[in-house]
Amino acid sequence: MEPGPDGPAAPGPAAIREGWFRETCSLWPGQALSLQVEQLLHHRRSRYQDILVFRSKTYGNVLVLDGVIQCTERDEFSYQEMIANLPLCSHPNPRKVLIIGGGDGGVLREVVKHPSVESVVQCEIDEDVIEVSKKFLPGMAVGFSSSKLTLHVGDGFEFMKQNQDAFDVIITDSSDPMGPAESLFKESYYQLMKTALKEDGILCCQGECQWLHLDLIKEMRHFCKSLFPVVDYAYCSIPTYPSGQIGFMLCSKNPSTNFREPVQQLTQAQVEQMQLKYYNSDMHRAAFVLPEFTRKALNDIS
């Protein structure tokens, strides 16, 4: 393993042993994901979390927060494109967008591609994640240079309390429900987002994995249905997330919203112009087709 620009690679963080990074977590017990490391690029502890970046043998640069992979250059586009386009293409005219989290810049990159979007506010509590991403994940962080962006380094909770009835779409790109991020999976957080949305507003949040967190997803869906007239759940595949999948919880204040049929259908020319690699209108529809065990658990009987 080569030395990196921020110092020698050895001994490196504890998660890297004999040239391999190994991800383990109490949220997915009994399983692990390993990636071969070519070079340790960055390892520091910010005010909020441990930040690690390494160049992998087959997945490009990898961002790890508190020992958990957040994104890799090879497969990040599937998650970023879906969490952004599922809500944006379900809204007839999304002009004002709020992003909570997403310090790597990937969601922002996708949001600003939409011509209808006039302004984006992003709230990221950890400025170090933004700076590290600009340095080591430039293909994701490119959105930070957009003239549509107002960047707020601080607490998204407090920001939304002060900005009610303000946004057409809110996207929460959170880490897993541990530590500070745990509050982003609670009913009180969804209630706060509801007040920050305009009367026909839509939200989309990282919704964990159906293979690992079905009870949590069911709980979230239950309280969301008490807050919003329209609630749905979708998912996509992404190799370096736990069990190779990640889900999305979508809610709308507009009773006529149908998440399963995009109101904005992209032509092939638009897909190519937006440089999309995963999302298209057919993939949008397919994302809501759940396997039988998930459909039953969520009582998703149409």
Curated annotation (Swiss-Prot):
Pathway: Amine and polyamine biosynthesis; spermidine biosynthesis; spermidine from putrescine: step 1/1. GO terms for biological process: cellular response to leukemia inhibitory factor; spermidine biosynthetic process. Its EC number is 2.5.1.16. It catalyses: S-adenosyl 3-(methylsulfanyl)propylamine + putrescine = S-methyl-5'-thioadenosine + spermidine + H(+). Residues 18-253 form the PABS domain. GO terms for molecular function: protein homodimerization activity; spermidine synthase activity. PROSITE patterns: PABS_1, PABS_2. Putrescine binds at Y79, D173, S174, S175, D176, Y241. InterPro entries: PABS, PABS_CS, SAM-dependent_MTases_sf, Spermi_synthase, Spermi_synthase_euk, Spermidine_synt_N, Spermidine_synt_N_sf. The keyword Phosphoprotein does not apply. The activity is thought to be regulated mainly by the availability of decarboxylated S-adenosylmethionine. The active site is at D173 (proton acceptor). It comes from the Eukaryota. Pfam families: Spermine_synt_N, Spermine_synth. The keyword Acetylation applies. Transmembrane segments: none annotated. Keywords: Acetylation, Polyamine biosynthesis, Spermidine biosynthesis, Transferase. S-adenosyl 3-(methylsulfanyl)propylamine binds at Q49, Q80, D104, E124, D155, G156, D173. The modification N-acetylmethionine is found at M1. Belongs to the spermidine/spermine synthase family. NCBIfam families: PRK00811.1, speE. Homodimer or homotetramer. Catalyzes the production of spermidine from putrescine and decarboxylated S-adenosylmethionine (dcSAM). Has a strong preference for putrescine as substrate, and has very low activity towards 1,3-diaminopropane. Has extremely low activity towards spermidine. This is Spermidine synthase. It comes from Mus musculus (Mouse).
